[in-house]
């Protein structure tokens, strides 16, 4: 099976144009690619004809002798030079065509909402009991629209996670971190650190019980690899590069896991391959210069557990559903109320054919905030990384499909816990599902996180 974008280019370039229009992409690139592909196929025919002629000559030479043999050998040498030049031309055209096609985003799935930005995202599910301050009820109802949800109106206004972390609990300090490292860094202390680790342990415990292989991946990738996994030209302001080194810090375990089979083939009967990666995540957040400046919701480093699947093309949508179901189960066990959102075409990243976000209700902010991103990247990454499956039984090869989803992003989930589990007196309840991961440690919180009387720093 050929790459889906190339296949659509050949079968129906107008459909490819229409697909790109859903992302507001310049469709003139399709016309350029069509011309390059026509040229490639034309030169390929010439190359195949020359190869045939050379094979015929080689066969004739083996049966000749004397001057006739010398004449044919010279003719063969000249033909070989022409063939080599044509093969070089073919390779150059193919590289130019594939470079152009590789600059295109993935094909958008049919059931993705059309729209240029996140205002066109469509909520498709709500879960849990939503805690809503009495002054925010109208705003809440506006956000849920006509959905039937279970919510509780409270008379006291919950404090934002940043205030809870630094001014109430005294278990974090972003100002001092900013002095020594810059904005969007933090110090976390004692019970919040235990909470961070318990979230990670819970996530890897749950996901591995679903049959996923636990992975601790490299925290850096070479330029060639990261360029294949993501659209680096678009995301260069989001990724940290090591100065004077061909190395980039990873933004998620998705990237090194996706590259695990870089330029390799996988036997079809071994698919699916399911992994749970745990790693730090490093992000510049340059495009979010004025967003979430306080607290630890949007930061340059955090811990993350990622789900990742290599799949056959025919099964990838089934596994996309599995990934978001796993993520939902995690947040249901944490008892954090959320909604699932089908992301609009103009808000999709280049890699994804379709993406679900899981957004938790934040009662202090009176809004839903993204905790999980779950994408089916179909063959977009696999083509760029040259990862194929081999079907020996039917003598076929094709590109695998890759899928990814957050299981837990620790700092974001902590912000959701601080806002949803706080009491009016400032005490924060530890989610019940996390408590067994804390029991073995004498200094870890067990049931509640209590405010300190004094700041640590």
From Swiss-Prot:
Top EC group: ligase
GO molecular-function terms, A-Z: ATP binding; serine-tRNA ligase activity; tRNA binding
Chemical reaction(s) catalysed: tRNA(Ser) + L-serine + ATP = L-seryl-tRNA(Ser) + AMP + diphosphate + H(+); tRNA(Sec) + L-serine + ATP = L-seryl-tRNA(Sec) + AMP + diphosphate + H(+)
Binding site for L-serine: 252-254, 306, 406
Biological processes, Gene Ontology terms: selenocysteine biosynthetic process; seryl-tRNA aminoacylation
Pathway(s) of this molecule: Aminoacyl-tRNA biosynthesis; selenocysteinyl-tRNA(Sec) biosynthesis; L-seryl-tRNA(Sec) from L-serine and tRNA(Sec): step 1/1
Key words of the record: Aminoacyl-tRNA synthetase, ATP-binding, Cytoplasm, Ligase, Nucleotide-binding, Protein biosynthesis
Compartments it resides in: Cytoplasm
Chain positions recorded as ATP binding sites: 283-285, 299, 370-373
Gene Ontology, cellular component aspect: cytosol
EC number per UniProt: 6.1.1.11
PANTHER family given in the database record: SERYL-TRNA SYNTHETASE (PTHR11778)
Function: Catalyzes the attachment of serine to tRNA(Ser). Is also able to aminoacylate tRNA(Sec) with serine, to form the misacylated tRNA L-seryl-tRNA(Sec), which will be further converted into selenocysteinyl-tRNA(Sec).
NCBIfam families cross-referenced by the UniProt entry: serS
Domain notes: Consists of two distinct domains, a catalytic core and a N-terminal extension that is involved in tRNA binding.
Binding partners and assembly: Homodimer. The tRNA molecule binds across the dimer.
Family designation: Belongs to the class-II aminoacyl-tRNA synthetase family. Type-1 seryl-tRNA synthetase subfamily.
Protein name: Serine--tRNA ligase
């Amino acid at each position: 099976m050929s790459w889906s974008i190339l296949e659509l280019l050949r079968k129906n370039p107008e459909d490819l144009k229409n697909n790109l229009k859903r992302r507001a992409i310049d469709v003139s690139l399709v016309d350029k690619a069509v011309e390059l592909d026509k040229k490639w196929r034309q030169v390929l025919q010439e190359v195949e004809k020359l190869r045939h002629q050379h094979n015929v000559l080689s066969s004739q030479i083996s049966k000749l002798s004397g001057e006739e043999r010398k004449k044919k050998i010279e003719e063969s040498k000249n033909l070989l030079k022409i063939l080599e030049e044509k093969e070089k031309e073919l390779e150059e055209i193919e590289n130019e065509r594939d470079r152009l096609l590789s600059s295109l985003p993935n094909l958008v799935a049919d059931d993705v909402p059309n729209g240029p930005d996140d205002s066109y995202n469509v909520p498709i599910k709500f879960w849990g009991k939503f805690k809503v301050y009495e002054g925010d009820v109208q705003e809440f109802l506006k956000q849920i629209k006509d959905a039937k949800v279970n919510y509780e109106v409270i008379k006291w206004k919950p404090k934002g996670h940043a205030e809870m972390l630094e001014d109430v609990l005294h278990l974090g300090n972003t100002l001092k971190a900013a002095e020594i490292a810059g904005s969007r860094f933090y110090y976390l202390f004692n019970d919040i650190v235990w909470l961070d680790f318990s979230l990670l342990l819970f996530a890897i415990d749950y996901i591995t019980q679903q049959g996923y292989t636990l992975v601790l991946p490299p925290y850096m990738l070479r330029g060639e690899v990261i360029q294949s996994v993501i659209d680096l030209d678009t995301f260069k302001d989001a990724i940290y590069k090591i100065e004077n080194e061909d190395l980039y810090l990873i933004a998620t375990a998705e990237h090194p896991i996706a590259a695990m089979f870089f330029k390799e083939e996988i036997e079809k009967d071994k698919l699916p391959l399911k992994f749970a990666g745990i790693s730090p995540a490093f992000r510049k957040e340059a495009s979010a210069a004025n967003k979430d400046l306080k607290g630890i919701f949007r930061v340059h480093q955090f811990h993350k557990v990622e789900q990742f699947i290599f799949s056959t093309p025919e099964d990838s949508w089934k596994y996309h559903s599995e990934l978001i179901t796993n993520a939902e189960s995690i947040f249901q066990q944490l008892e954090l109320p959320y909604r699932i959102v089908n992301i609009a075409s103009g808000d999709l990243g280049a890699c994804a054919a379709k993406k679900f976000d899981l957004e938790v209700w934040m009662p202090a902010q009176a809004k839903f905030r993204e905790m999980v991103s779950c994408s089916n990247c179909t063959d977009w990454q696999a083509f760029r990384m040259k990862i194929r499956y081999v079907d020996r039984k039917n003598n076929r090869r094709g590109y695998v499909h890759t899928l990814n989803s957050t299981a837990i992003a620790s700092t974001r989930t902590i912000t959701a816990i601080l806002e949803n589990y706080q009491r009016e007196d400032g005490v924060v309840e530890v989610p019940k599902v996390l408590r067994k991961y804390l029991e073995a440690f004498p200094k870890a919180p067990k049931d509640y996180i209590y405010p300190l009387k004094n700041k640590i720093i």
